[in-house]
Regions:
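Hydrophobic alpha-helical transmembrane segments
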Residues: 55-68
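Juxtamembrane "helix exit" motif at the C-terminal ends of alpha-helical transmembrane segments
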Residues: 39-56
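Hydrophobic alpha-helical cores of multi-pass transmembrane domains in eukaryotic membrane proteins
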Residues: 38-42, 66-73
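Cysteine-rich micro-motifs
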Residues: 174-185
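Conserved non-transmembrane functional hotspots
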Residues: 1-38, 73-172
Length: 185
């Protein structure tokens, strides 16, 4: 049935959007954490190893000062942008969209094997989960660029033609593709 294939296609692409966001946020969060630990550790280790009279200690303090400014800037950016909340939202979306995608694949395999009433119950459950997750994902401000990315990922994975350019993507990268459905991201 077409609606099951559609849910599978969309859920896969949506999980790719939020996985991509999650990886970007993960790197940023690691930088903030690294700088927060590195600065005091660098000064502490230098003083413990070489004492307060070490000739290079002023250079270490200067480097630590610059690193502290960077760390404070990243920390402030993280707080204002809500990186931790966004990371959690992305992780929840990836997990749930992947579960919906897997469920859709399972339901699709049962088409023709189950009687129509049981199949309808499975499809209704799948549709309800998909629509609820879709509403939650809409609050996460998905851009047109991300939608094109998701469409390309799904078209490539499912070996389907893009709905605009009617081409099956051969790679995950858009390259010179100028299609408004699967390129320009």
């Amino acid at each position: 049935r077409a609606e099951v294939a559609h849910i599978e296609f969309i859920s896969y692409g949506t999980s790719r959007i939020f996985d991509r966001r999650m990886r970007s946020l993960d790197w940023k969060r690691k930088v903030v954490t690294f700088l927060g630990v590195f600065v005091p550790l660098m000064i502490g280790c230098a003083v413990l190893s070489f004492g307060l009279e070490a000739p290079f200690l002023p250079l270490c303090i200067t480097i630590a000062g610059v690193a502290s400014i960077m760390q404070l800037g990243f920390s402030l950016w993280s707080l204002v942008s809500g990186w931790d909340r966004s990371y959690s939202d992305c992780m929840a979306s990836v997990k749930e969209n992947t579960a919906i995608y897997n469920l859709a694949g399972s339901v699709r395999k049962k088409i023709g094997k189950l009687d129509e009433a049981k199949l309808e119950i499975l499809i209704d459950d799948l549709t309800e989960k998909f629509e609820r997750r879709e509403q939650e994902d809409l609050t996460l401000c998905v851009s047109d660029k991300e939608l094109r990315y998701a469409n390309r990922m799904s078209c490539f994975y499912f070996k389907k033609k893009c709905h605009i350019c009617n081409v099956v993507p051969l790679t995950l990268k858009p390259g010179k593709c100028v299609c408004d459905g699967c390129g320009k991201f």
